[in-house]
Amino acid sequence: MPTTTIDIHPHIISGDATRYPLAPLGGHQSDWSRTRPVTLEQLVAAMDTAGVQKAAIVQASTCYGHDNSYLADAVSAYSKRFTGVFSVDVLAPGAPERMHHWRVKGLTGMRLFTFGSTMSEQADWLDDPKSYPAWACASELGLSICLQMSAKAIPQVIRMAERFPKVRIILDHCARPELADGPPYSAAASLFALARYSNVYLKLTPRIFAESRRGKATPETFFPRLVSEFGASRLAWGSNYPSSEGSLPQLLDIARQSLACLPNADRDWIFVKTARTLYPVLAD
């Protein structure tokens, strides 16, 4: 196993709602951010316990919406250990200006939240032409874009991957594929169809590890297939802590167990090297 581990999907929630007021997307705070919040300091302690050296902290969209202030302050406080993945309204005319604002504050990725948690239906704006200036700005700034979405939005991802080939697109939870049918995983055909787009990356989170054990699926048949289609250099681990239940050491252990079927070289990409590709600042 790699001696260094990088997490590209933890979240943080401040205990100071006055300094960092709630502004959740859709107007409804997620249950996890209310019942098991983790502050910056608690994340640092959890990472130390788990042996996770660095992280790309993802904006808690269902708590703070597009106000990335707490995230920016966290990255500023630990600039050698963290980068941040911010959120803006990409359909708004001033989106590129907001993106520049957060980039200057040390945030090197952007998140688009279109499905999940408090949003039960897949949004239809992912490939809206009004978002093109924001995507062009991401290309200019070298920002990776991670997408919280369902597999229903894969056709939209294809259109954006083709239109903006220089933007690294990361699919949270591997776009939530259905794996219970088992090999050859025909129900996940739309996911595998994305392999031909070299700018599309997959984030391996607790959700996909659980899905890989559902029905006829097994980690030993699914993850080698994923590597054979995409290559390990386009796969990266994200804990989804604390949104996913369990301690950070437990979530990392689940990931390691699930990926034990892969060669060491592949796991080195998934736990370290791909993260450095997506967020080069974490390689410093």
Each model region followed by its residue ranges:
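Histidine-centered divalent metal-coordination motifs
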Residues: 9-15, 148, 173
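Mid-to-C-terminal alpha-helical segments outside catalytic/metal-binding sites
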Residues: 3-6, 19, 23-54, 202, ...
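Short, acidic/polar
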Residues: 36-46, 92-102, 186-187
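A generic "structured core" feature
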Residues: 5-6, 10-13, 48, 129, ...
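Active-site neighborhood of phospho(di)ester-bond hydrolases with catalytic His/Asp-centered motifs
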Residues: 5-8, 58, 85-86, 111, ...
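Catalytic pocket-lining loop regions of alpha/beta-barrel enzymes
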Residues: 124-237
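Active-site gating/metal-coordination segments in enzymes
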Residues: 53, 62-152, 158-159, 201-208
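Conserved, mostly hydrophobic/aromatic
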Residues: 9, 47, 71, 102, ...
